[in-house]
Amino acid sequence: MMTFSELPPVPSDHLVLLSDQLRLAVAAYLARFKGASRYHTESDLRCYLAWCAEHDLDPLAARRPHLELYIRWMQEVRRFKPSTVSRRFSVAAGFYRTCVIDGLMEHSPAEHVRRPAGWRPAAWCK
């Protein structure tokens, strides 16, 4: 498996330049939710953004391997239950879907990420 250090670095000055754009992207995504859903979605997105910050990764420059490493981190380092990993990844994927809708990205880096084991669609999707 590829490690984070094998991925090309994202220059830290790039992070500063995109901070306003990232804030706008986060606000646009969270605006789609209200009440408890917004609160819990914000918490899950905050976890992903913190992971990105720990790895000096601009979330708007993330690629598919970064998201797969995020999943592995949740599974192997944090030892989250499969349902938690699935939910938190779904929030990150939704964030990127909104970025594509809003024209901030051409395509979502989450689009072809292998879903974690134990993932299944929500009951209402069946």
Regions found by a protein language model. Name each.
Residues 12-26:
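Short alpha-helical hairpin
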Residues 26-39, 46-124:
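N-terminal core-binding DNA-recognition domain of tyrosine recombinases/integrases
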